[in-house]
Amino acid sequence: MMEKNSKIYVAGHRGMVGSAIVRELKKQGYNNIVVRTHNELDLLCQKDVEGFFSEEKPEYVFLAAAKVGGILANESALADFMYDNIMLEMNVIHSAWKNGCKKLEFLGSSCIYPRLAKQPMKEECLLTGELEKTNEAYALAKISGLKYCEFLNRQYGTDYISVMPTNLYGPNDNYHPMHSHVLPALIRRFHEAKIEGKRSVTCWGDGSPLREFLYVDDLANLCVFLMNHYSGNETVNAGTGKELSIWELTDLVANIVGYHGSIEWDLSKPNGTPRKLLDISKATKLGWVYKTELEDGIRLAYQDFLDNPIRAER
């Protein structure tokens, strides 16, 4: 279990997940948190990462750094998504092991599970079927990271754990029109349509896919909880256990943003995986419960978007 003065490194502290973990750690009284910006430490450079771990010797590591994006970003940069994510994961995990890190927590994604996996998806369904093609590169990279943690545990007795979150949203999200995920993309799209007085907004696909969403501060709470209370080779799913269709989501976001025009659907665009709902029974049996309902979380996320307009340009 982490002490309040344990040296804790959060990789990716400027991203949505990493910044939420830092907030949660500070909220709980941890006072020796180490972070580095990309300019200070390029996680793709093995030499630099090894030098950082050799000098700092963090006792605990939260690996929240990743190259992320929605369907468009993933499909247009398959090689980049695979290379960048595998390299940064391996550099951090391997350097942590070489320098005696007590415990590491790897943040993955629910996209690691098969496209047509039985719902809700249990942790053990990993590698039992074909992946969703629109984010296959990212999924394979994340699978590599969690498997490397598992293999280090099995071969060297390390205590490295993996968490697989569902779709995330909340403060410090990425609202870029080309690189964002569905929920922040909808927030931006409906906000701009409201400001510009557009009569209609067009969304991808037909609205039928079912999705689950978890507020990022709830994930951060789980991450700290697991670092202190869980060890094992099995991954732990992070979600709410609740789902809604993309059609229902667009209607909810439009109402919260205050857009009252019509919503149209571009059937030439891909839907992605038809359904993604995580089985979160493992996390709940450990004693964790999420706190933020979707409508409340979207209101908080929209306010964060309004308070920080520069995020829309990332």
Enumerate the predicted regions with their spans:
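Flexible, glycine-rich beta-alpha linker
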Residues: 112-114, 137, 161-185, 209-210
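Short-chain dehydrogenase/reductase
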Residues: 82, 86, 134-146, 176-184, ...
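Adenosine-cofactor binding site in Rossmann-like domains, unifying the SAM/SAH pocket
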Residues: 26-51
